[in-house]
């Protein structure tokens, strides 16, 4: 199901994001996400520390858990043969496969589950699994669209 159109996107040293204008009138926005039988509310988030257990769901690898190994990581991609370093990312040992990027990453505290970011990349491969997964973290730039946005003022790239 198509829910909208991408009106702007950014891939820079601090951002890897897209802004979607909802155009499907049959799509209902919600601040609740159901992942692996866990309910994540978009109005809750949590700062994690090294050693914290995280959970992620990838399109290819499915449900995985792991441990945060760094809260101040960075990863360098090559875009148009130029290096681009993304900073302020979490590094975990949750295995990631190609196609997992964009998958939800969350943690648990008590009986509550909190969104902490999305899977973004990986560093080392071993038997088709990566040892380090980079998590684009919601902590410093958390923005939620609870209601459809009027994006008519945004410049199109």
Predicted regions and their residues:
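Serine endopeptidase catalytic core focused on the charge-relay Asp
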Residues: 1-80, 107-109, 120, 139, ...
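Helical hairpin unit composed of two closely spaced alpha helices linked by a short loop
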Residues: 66-96, 101-102
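Conserved catalytic-core subdomain
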Residues: 87-90, 118-157
């Amino acid at each position: 199901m198509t829910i909208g159109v991408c009106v702007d996107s950014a891939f820079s040293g601090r951002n890897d994001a897209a802004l979607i204008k909802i155009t499907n009138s049959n799509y209902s926005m919600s601040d609740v996400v159901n992942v692996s039988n866990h309910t994540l509310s978009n109005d809750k988030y949590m700062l994690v520390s090294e050693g914290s257990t995280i959970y992620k769901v990838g399109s290819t690898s499915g449900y995985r858990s792991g441990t945060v190994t760094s809260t101040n990581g960075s990863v360098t991609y090559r875009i148009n043969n130029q290096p681009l370093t993304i900073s302020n990312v979490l590094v975990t040992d949750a295995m990631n496969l190609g196609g997992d990027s964009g998958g939800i990453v969350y943690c648990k505290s008590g009986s509550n589950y909190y969104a902490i970011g999305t899977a973004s990349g990986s560093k080392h491969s071993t038997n088709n699994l990566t040892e380090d997964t980079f998590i684009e973290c919601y902590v410093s730039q958390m923005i939620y669209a609870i209601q459809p946005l009027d994006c008519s003022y945004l410049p199109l790239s």
